[in-house]
């Protein structure tokens, strides 16, 4: 089972995690207080836990995405940032993470200078393909 939250603090309990399938994944990204704290999620049996906070291991935060997405959109003067562009950025991010870097405790570095460069071309190509690029 997978939980991806960007909702409200404390809405997931350890007891809820215990009802999930083995090796559950929880991305509790509500800020500043996550849906469940990492220690509580692990106590419930979660295998992978990430939050949006830099003071917990395995931070997953939108701060990682903004620079690359906006740079790519600005460079082609995109009139919109559409779903296709976001998917292109997501795929580029997934390709950036090596097997050696990926672990249960670290999906990727919270601030990674490679991200913006990795996303530029796929994002720009997607903007052009979907007709939102003006350059």
Model-predicted segments: where are they?
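Adenosine-phosphate binding glycine-rich loop
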Residues: 28-135
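Rossmann-like NAD(P)-binding element
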Residues: 1-30, 34-35
């Amino acid at each position: 089972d997978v939980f991806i939250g960007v909702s409200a603090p404390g809405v997931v309990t350890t007891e809820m995690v215990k009802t999930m399938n083995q090796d559950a994944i929880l991305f509790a990204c509500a800020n500043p207080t996550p849906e469940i704290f990492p220690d509580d999620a692990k106590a419930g049996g979660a295998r992978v836990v990430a939050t949006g906070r830099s003071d917990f291991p395995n931070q997953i935060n939108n701060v990682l995405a903004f620079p690359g997405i906006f740079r790519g959109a600005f460079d082609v003067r995109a009139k919109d940032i559409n779903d296709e562009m976001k998917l292109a950025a997501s795929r580029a991010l997934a390709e950036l993470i090596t097997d050696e870097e990926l672990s249960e405790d670290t999906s990727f570095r919270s601030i990674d200078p490679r991200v913006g460069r990795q996303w530029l071309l796929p994002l720009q190509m997607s903007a052009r393909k979907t007709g939102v690029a003006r350059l």
